[in-house]
């Protein structure tokens, strides 16, 4: 339908297929109220199916596709427990519909008690009703607006930056129209709650209610018809929604009703039961005995399908309130490995194919192999799989068992004959477990001569050493044992026999590398030039030379005159001292190191028992009250500095404890005598 420039419309928004029942009930409630205004709905084509669009076109005058605007910062949506509102910013596309003069926007979860056509006469640019959760804010479920691109671009910039205190459209619009919106009466956007209702106010203003808004995630079509069956105020409001739905979609068996009932909980199940009931009533009595079995089968099929239709759809709804954990329905089938160790024996004849197949079965097996397709099929190796021989018959087995004693007797009568490699029929019965005969002493590559030669080359030096040691401690052995030992043991999987393997110690010895014998492949490398032989190398002498060389090097590098320039290298070149340019007297090089005069440490004095040493003289002078000289003339200390005047130090005035006590500690002024020892007690007591 062509849009008339400057007309007024009721508009709604559909973001997914799940809100189809709400959008249709809203349109029908406005039509039933007698409005003559056009109805428009904004949809996001990427989230709406074609069958849903067809249903909207039967009720709405304009179906307008718009672009989805999502919130990339949905943290505040989780605070409200409404992550489904991540695309609520799409609502700002209403201001982009400048082909309309005035738009009365109504959410798809609203049912109209009456059509509020008087809202189109408001002179304000934007009007909205207060929110029940915070009345200082307005609710964006019902709005009256005048489309303009200025507000659209301003709110689009806020949406792109995620500016919204609740993460949804209501926070964004309240921040944009904070001081410029016109406040509507609460009767234009009554938001009931199942937990709280101001019942006296509802009874008083019940006759003036215009629009009823079901906020939250639990919509009437999501809860189902049987969820609210009481007589409370909230149940009465939900009943108004179901009244409009039943007036247009209940009891009709057409394609439109089937599409709508698919999104309403419990309605598809009731529709199937009603169809089944109608078919059973219309069935002629003459044909009842012919189709009795068919009815039983169809009833079972319908019951299974009904339970599936009434089940919870996780892609559209939240889990039911009284649902049980889904883990109880997990399959409990357990598979175990077969414990049968018997080899597979193919049957003598396979069953014949059925005769009533649509394709023709070949009468004989094909004699020619199919042509190869892949390259590896042309050069495929010969199969090496060995199939078990059929078990011997009972008669042959008994004959072999009777012949066993004679074979044993003949073998005992000729002890000088060497045993043959062919096995004789065993005298002991076979074990019940066939895996006992399995051996791992041989591999397929043990008989390849190239591998044997390669292993012999690697172990040649070991065998030569072992042969030499064996020759030194050889002793006479039997011919059979000598023949068995002369065999080359190049097989990797062979394990030495009891005679070949030595007695192992309790503590394992470390593994040593291979050593070559003196007479075989021994090679001496020439000595390097300038490197002494090992016998001529003395570590102590070399360390002493290194210490002397280091001392000489340090003395050469440390030569420095007392005054004048600095010595550089071993040549002793001096840098002449010269004055710095004017203004650069205080400048210092980054690598300059401050030179301090040498400080002489006090030298220890040798003990002197005659009482004439310097220490005793200092103490004597101190007692007499004289000055204590810092330096004496008895010991002359060489000093590179110029002669300085003698410095005297006054005696200390502190008379407290010595250095053994810390500051703040007390020192004893008197002593307490100790108790007598046991020996002294014995003397005193006697």
UniProtKB/Swiss-Prot annotation:
Annotated positions binding UDP: 13, 16, 19, 82, 107-109, 213, 216, 219
UniProt subunit comment: Interacts with glycogen synthase gsy-1; the interaction is direct.
Site (Important for catalytic activity): 91
Cofactor annotation: Mn(2+)
Taxonomy of the source species: Eukaryota, Fungi, Dikarya, Ascomycota, Pezizomycotina
GO molecular-function terms, A-Z: glycogenin glucosyltransferase activity; glycosyltransferase activity; metal ion binding
PANTHER family, A to Z: GLYCOGENIN SUBFAMILY MEMBER
Subcellular location: Cytoplasm; Vacuole
Family to which the UniProt record says this protein belongs: Belongs to the glycosyltransferase 8 family. Glycogenin subfamily.
Protein induction: Expressed during vegetative growth and repressed during carbon starvation.
Organism: Neurospora crassa (strain ATCC 24698 / 74-OR23-1A / CBS 708.71 / DSM 1257 / FGSC 987)
Keyword Cytoplasm: yes
Protein name: Glycogenin
GO CC terms in record: cytoplasm; vacuole
One BP annotation, GO: glycogen biosynthetic process
Listed Low complexity bias regions: 285-308, 398-416
Region named Disordered: 264-331, 381-444, 460-533, 603-686
Residues covered by region (Not required for catalytic activity): 307-686
EC class of the enzyme, as a word: transferase
Residues binding UDP-alpha-D-glucose: 13, 16, 19, 82, 91, 107-109, 139-140, 166, 169-170, 216, 219
């Amino acid at each position: 339908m062509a849009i008339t420039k400057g007309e007024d419309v009721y508009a709604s928004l559909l973001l997914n297929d799940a809100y189809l029942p709400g959008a249709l009930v809203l349109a029908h409630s406005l039509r039933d109220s007698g409005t003559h205004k056009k109805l428009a709905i904004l949809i996001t084509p990427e989230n709406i199916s074609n069958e849903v669009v067809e249903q909207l076109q039967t009720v709405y005058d304009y179906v307008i596709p718009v672009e989805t605007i999502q919130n990339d910062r949905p943290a505040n949506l989780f605070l409200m427990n409404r992550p489904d509102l991540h695309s609520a910013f799409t609502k700002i596309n209403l201001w982009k519909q400048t082909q309309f003069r005035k738009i009365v926007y109504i959410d798809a979860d609203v049912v109209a008690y009456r059509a509020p056509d008087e809202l189109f006469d408001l002179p304000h640019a934007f009007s909205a009703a207060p929110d029940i959760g915070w009345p200082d804010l307005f609710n964006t479920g019902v709005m009256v607006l005048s489309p303009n691109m200025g507000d659209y671009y301003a709110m689009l910039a806020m949406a792109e930056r995620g500016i919204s205190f609740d993460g949804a459209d209501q926070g964004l619009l309240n921040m944009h129209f904070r001081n410029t919106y016109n406040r509507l009466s609460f009767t234009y956007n009554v938001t009931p709650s199942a937990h709280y209702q101001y019942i006296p106010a509802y009874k008083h203003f019940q006759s003036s209610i215009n629009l009823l808004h079901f906020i939250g995630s639990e919509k009437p079509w999501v809860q189902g018809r049987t969820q609210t069956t009481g007589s409370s105020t909230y149940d009465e409001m939900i009943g108004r929604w179901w009244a409009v739905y039943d007036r247009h979609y209940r009891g009709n068996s057409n394609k439109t009703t089937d599409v709508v009932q698919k999104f309403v909980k419990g309605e598809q199940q009731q529709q199937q039961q009603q169809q089944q009931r109608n078919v059973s009533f219309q069935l002629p009595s003459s044909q009842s005995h012919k189709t009795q079995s068919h009815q039983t089968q169809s009833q079972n099929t319908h019951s299974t399908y009904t339970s599936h239709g009434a089940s919870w759809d996780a892609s559209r709804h939240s889990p039911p309130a009284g649902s049980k954990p889904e883990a109880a329905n997990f399959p409990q089938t357990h598979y175990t490995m077969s414990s049968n160790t018997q080899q597979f024996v193919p049957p003598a004849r396979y069953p014949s194919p059925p005769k009533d197949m649509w394709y023709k079965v070949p009468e004989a097996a094909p004699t020619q192999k199919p042509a190869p397709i892949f390259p590896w099929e042309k050069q495929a190796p010969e199969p090496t799989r060995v199939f078990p021989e059929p078990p011997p018959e009972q008669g042959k087995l008994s004959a072999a068992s009777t012949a066993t004693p004679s074979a044993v007797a003949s073998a005992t009568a000729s002890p000088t004959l060497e045993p043959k490699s062919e096995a004789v029929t065993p005298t002991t019965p076979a074990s019940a477990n066939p895996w006992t005969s399995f051996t791992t002493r041989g591999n397929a590559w043990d008989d390849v001569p190239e591998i044997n030669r390669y292993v012999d080359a690697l172990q040649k030096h070991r065998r030569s050493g072992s042969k030499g040691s064996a020759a030194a401690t050889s002793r006479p052995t039997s011919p059979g044992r000598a023949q068995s030992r002369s065999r080359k043991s190049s097989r990797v999987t062979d394990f030495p026999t009891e005679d070949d393997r030595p007695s192992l110690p309790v503590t394992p010895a470390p593994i040593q590398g291979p050593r070559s014998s003196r007479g075989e492949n021994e090679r001496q490398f020439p000595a390097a030039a300038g490197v002494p032989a090992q016998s001529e190398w003395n570590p102590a002498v070399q360390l002493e030379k290194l210490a002397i060389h280091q001392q000489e090097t340090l003395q050469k590098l440390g030569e420095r005159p007392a005054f004048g320039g600095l010595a550089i290298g071993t040549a002793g070149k001096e840098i002449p001292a010269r004055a710095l340019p004017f203004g650069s007297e205080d400048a210092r090089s980054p690598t300059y190191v401050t030179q301090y005069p040498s400080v002489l440490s006090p030298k220890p004095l040798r003990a002197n028992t005659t009482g004439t040493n310097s220490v005793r003289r200092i103490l004597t002078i101190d007692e007499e009250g004289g000055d204590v000289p810092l330096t004496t003339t008895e010991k002359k200390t060489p000093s590179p500095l110029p002669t300085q005047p003698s410095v005297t130090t006054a005696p200390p005035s502190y008379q407290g404890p010595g250095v053994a006590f810390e500051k703040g500690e007390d020192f004893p002024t008197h002593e307490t005598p100790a108790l007598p020892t046991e020996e002294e007690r014995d003397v005193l007591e006697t």
